[in-house]
């Protein structure tokens, strides 16, 4: 009680060698004003990364204009080399061109060929003992400032990037329990820059063995039947086994401290509570989130000793305590009391999938995102279609916006054909088509440059899912993006005696009676025992397609299928229009709603752009927010982490 006062699975070697650079300080970025506080709106928030501004695409000019401070580094000088998208390279990737000492080294090399040895030595000494140089060591971005601080703290203790992501993701389940938690699941995307390797760790929930037939599921299905087998803690443990550095018990102990010592209620949590309907009416839920019958207010100080005890237990006894212990029995009993069918075998059978991401090349970069049952192939398809259009800064704004809308319609329609490939082999074939550049060329021909077309999938896509986002770029040269969820806010609303809030992920399956229009479900996403539902949890990582130097990005979004639309637009802003990350996250976004054939645009969308769209036949619907997208960017040795400026709670920290 709060005190308010193998198939797809692959076996990978545990552990990962980490070459740690020195971290001298962890400055806190200034807290941002809540949404709407600034007189000029969200565009004023672009100043958050003003120290880079356009320089995050031109680090050399930044170096020349700043007094630089050199920090010790354990990496050798850096260089570039050509590597295939998913091939490992043993050569030190940072041995030349990527070094921010590039200009100095050029001078040294020239001097070595021109002057005597003594002059050369003098020049080398000047570089090493003259004006110091600045390196950014990492970045952490999460939906809550408390969790961002925890992530940077883990890096300060020389934890790996994955360690920081684990602690931050578990923290998010404490501070924003409506969006994620131990009773949910998600997906993690990990990229090793040095080895040019990527892993998707899929810990999405699965349907229980006793799930009713599709025809027996109704709109008013009992909340217990909406609960899938949680995967959150096993997913974090698998990630730690592969890429962790600090002890598991230490990571969970640090997270438990957040619950035990307390935190302030976020605006997002308070908003979710204020919008609650009668679904969440159990006595235990009321005690936790609606004390005295009133929702918690922003800033209210809350402690969660119940979750602290659970995390300490999992840290000491491992994940077996969750999947074959007293916690298991609690979850089963609570689900049964709410009409569910979970049994012990569901927990003992649960496993995490480790696989490679799907990827494409776009504007000289590789883009990685999760494979099915996640909608990554649909995101890739959108980029492949857009790449064939003549999109430039000087081109027609109206054409670009129209192409974007029509492309997203196609991508979202394709996504309705995805599901768990382990239960339907056709999904693999479908996904391969979405990844094809030639197929994208054919789909591009379907777009009429002057007129909108109507497209409605036979079953609705997940559009309102709450989710937590964590992005980490650490000094070990790993990039990590995690998106976790309970599905709709507060999941099923079922809370165990230990304080675990359970998910409602069965809603992400397709079943005919889920909606009022009784749309026919697609077979690839039917609810069947042991299957994972289709997902729009889309952590996305970008790196240069050739060599090691250039722009690296990490992005994640929330709000179901709207995350796909928003991530695509941010990628185009950065990679096509060469905008800096701050501006790319701030710009207005759009999302086509296929069921209603309307086009949602957020409050930052310019009226001039709306006029362009209306002229092409689009029916525009203004909404406050389409999706929140956070980002982290690395350009050579410069790293910055930024939250979506629409969020009053999220925080990005750049580590020097």
Go through the PLM ranges and name each one.
Residues 10, 15-33, 39-153, 157-374, ...:
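Noncatalytic scaffold domains of N-terminal-nucleophile
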Residues 528-532, 567, 574-624:
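Extended C-terminal subregions enriched in glycine
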Residues 369-372, 377, 527-530, 542-562, ...:
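Extended C-terminal regions of large enzymes
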Residues 175-178, 187-191, 195, 199, ...:
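Active-site rim segments in enzyme catalytic domains, especially the processed small/beta chain
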Residues 180-192, 468-473, 539-541, 628-635, ...:
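Short beta-strand scaffold segments in enzyme catalytic cores
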Residues 164-169, 249-260, 330-333, 396-415, ...:
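Short, well-structured alpha-helical segments that form the helix of a local strand-helix-strand
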Residues 285, 292-293, 340, 389-486, ...:
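Internal maturation/activation junctions in enzymes
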Residues 354, 464-467, 535-537:
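Short, small/polar residue-rich loop motifs at catalytic or cofactor-binding pockets
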């Amino acid at each position: 009680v709060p005190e308010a006062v193998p198939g797809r699975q692959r076996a990978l070697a545990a552990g990962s060698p980490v070459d740690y650079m020195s971290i001298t300080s962890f400055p806190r970025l200034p807290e941002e004003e809540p949404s709407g506080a600034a007189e000029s709106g969200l565009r004023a928030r672009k100043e958050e990364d003003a120290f880079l501004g356009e320089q995050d695409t031109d680090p050399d000019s930044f170096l020349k204009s700043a007094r630089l401070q050199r920090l010790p580094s354990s990496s050798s000088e850096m260089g570039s080399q050509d590597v295939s998208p998913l091939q490992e390279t043993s050569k030190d990737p940072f041995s030349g061109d990527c070094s921010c000492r590039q200009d100095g080294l050029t001078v040294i090399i020239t001097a070595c060929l021109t002057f005597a040895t003594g002059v050369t030595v003098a020049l080398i000494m000047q570089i090493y003992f003259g004006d110091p140089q600045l390196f950014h060591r990492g970045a952490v971005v999460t939906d809550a400032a408390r969790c961002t601080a925890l992530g940077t703290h883990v890096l300060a203790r020389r934890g790996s990037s994955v360690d920081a992501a684990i602690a931050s993701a578990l923290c998010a389940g404490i501070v924003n329990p409506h969006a994620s938690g131990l009773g949910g699941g998600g997906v993690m995307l990990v990229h090793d820059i040095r080895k040019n390797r990527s892993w998707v760790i899929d810990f999405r929930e699965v349907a229980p063995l006793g799930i009713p037939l599709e025809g027996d599921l109704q709109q008013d299905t009992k909340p217990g039947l909406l609960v899938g087998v949680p995967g959150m803690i096993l997913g974090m443990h698998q990630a730690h086994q592969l890429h962790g550095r600090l002890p598991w018990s230490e990571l969970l102990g640090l997270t438990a401290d957040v619950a035990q010592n307390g935190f302030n209620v976020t605006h997002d949590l308070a908003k979710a509570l204020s919008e609650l309907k009668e679904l969440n009416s159990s006595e235990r839920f009321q005690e936790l989130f609606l004390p005295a019958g009133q929702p918690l207010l922003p800033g209210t100080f809350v402690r969660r000793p119940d979750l602290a005890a659970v995390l300490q237990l999992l840290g000491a006894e491992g994940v077996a305590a969750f999947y074959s212990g007293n916690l298991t029995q609690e979850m089963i009993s609570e689900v049964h009391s709410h009409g569910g069918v979970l049994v012990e075998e569901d927990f003992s059978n649960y496993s995490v999938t480790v696989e490679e991401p799907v990827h494409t090349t776009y504007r000289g970069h590789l883009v990685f995102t999760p494979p099915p049952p996640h909608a990554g192939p649909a995101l890739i398809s959108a980029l492949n279609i857009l790449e064939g259009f003549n999109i430039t800064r000087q081109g027609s704004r109206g054409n670009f916006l129209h192409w974007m809308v029509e492309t997203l319609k196609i991508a979202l329609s394709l996504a309705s054909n995805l599901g768990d490939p382990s239960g339907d082999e056709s999904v693999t074939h479908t996904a391969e088509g979405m990844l094809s550049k030639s197929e994208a060329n054919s789909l591009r021909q379907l777009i009429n440059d002057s007129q909108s077309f109507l497209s409605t999938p036979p079953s609705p896509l997940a559009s309102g899912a709450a989710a937590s986002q964590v992005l980490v770029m650490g000094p070990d040269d790993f990039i990590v993006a995690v998106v976790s969820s309970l599905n709709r806010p507060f999941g099923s609303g079922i809370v165990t005696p230990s304080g675990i809030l359970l998910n409602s992920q069965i809603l992400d399956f397709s079943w005919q009676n889920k909606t009022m229009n009784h749309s026919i479900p697609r077979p690839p996403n039917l609810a069947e025992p042991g299957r994972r539902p289709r997902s729009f949890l889309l952590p996305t990582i970008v790196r240069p397609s050739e060599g090691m130097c250039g722009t690296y990005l990490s992005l994640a979004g929330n709000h179901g299928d709207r995350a796909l639309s928003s991530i695509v637009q941010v990628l185009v802003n950065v990679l096509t229009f060469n905008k800096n990350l701050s501006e790319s996250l701030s710009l207005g976004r759009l999302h086509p709603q296929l069921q209603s054939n309307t086009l949602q645009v957020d409050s930052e969308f310019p009226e001039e752009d709306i006029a362009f769209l209306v002229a092409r036949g689009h029916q525009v619907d203004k909404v406050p927010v389409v999706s929140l997208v956070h980002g982290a960017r690395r350009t050579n040795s410069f790293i910055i982490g930024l939250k979506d400026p629409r969020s009053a709670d999220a925080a990005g920290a750049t580590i020097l």
